């Protein structure tokens, strides 16, 4: 993926303002609520029976933070996203058997969460840069499947 200086600035500038715990928890909770079939990968998380249960679930919060923290690795390694996610791709493919389409869904949800949290700061240019990033991360995570 080729990044312009402006794209890098838009991504890193916004990332510096992201509350990883809150945005991560919200993104994962939204994924599980909006796309309920993704819940099957989180059976060990306990009660996922309703939106309220999902939002209040401490394991969802913790894993959401973990997921968004790994996204931070992409932000730090924009020029090497494939290698950055090689091990996670292997884990999600070989051990967890996650449908790679779910990575794209989570990326789309993250865009919605960022837009909700940052409003006007999440300009169309910023959204375009972040959309490119979530696509690159989803592609890197799906790499082991190809």
From Swiss-Prot:
Swiss-Prot/TrEMBL keywords: Heme, Iron, Metal-binding, Oxygen transport, Transport
Annotated Globin domain residues: 2-146
Record PROSITE patterns: GLOBIN (PS01033)
GO annotation, biological process: hydrogen peroxide catabolic process
Example of a GO MF term: oxygen binding
Gene3D superfamilies membership: Globins
UniProt keyword annotation of Acetylation present: no
Any Pfam family: Globin
Record-level GO cellular component terms: blood microparticle; haptoglobin-hemoglobin complex; hemoglobin complex
InterPro entries (alphabetical): Globin, Globin-like_sf, Globin/Proto, Hemoglobin_b, Hemoglobin_oxygen_transport
Function summary: Involved in oxygen transport from the lung to the various peripheral tissues.
Subunit structure: Heterotetramer of two alpha chains and two beta chains.
Name of the protein in its database record: Hemoglobin subunit beta
The organism of origin for this protein: Aegypius monachus (Cinereous vulture)
Gene for this chain: HBB
């Amino acid at each position: 993926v080729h990044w312009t200086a402006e794209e890098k600035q838009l991504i890193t500038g916004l990332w510096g303002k992201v509350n990883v715990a809150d945005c991560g928890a919200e993104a994962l909770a939204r994924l599980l609520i909006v796309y309920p079939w993704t819940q099957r990968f989180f059976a060990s998380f306990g009660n996922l029976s309703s939106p309220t249960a999902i939002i209040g679930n401490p394991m969802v919060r913790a894993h959401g933070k973990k997921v968004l923290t790994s996204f931070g690795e992409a932000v730090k390694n924009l020029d090497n996203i494939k290698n950055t996610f090689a091990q996670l791709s292997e884990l999600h493919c070989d051990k967890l058997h996650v449908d790679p389409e779910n990575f794209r869904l989570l990326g789309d949800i993250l865009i919605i969460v960022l837009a909700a949290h940052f409003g006007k700061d999440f300009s169309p240019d910023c959204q375009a840069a972040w959309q490119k990033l979530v696509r690159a991360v989803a592609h890197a995570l799906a790499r082991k499947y190809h």
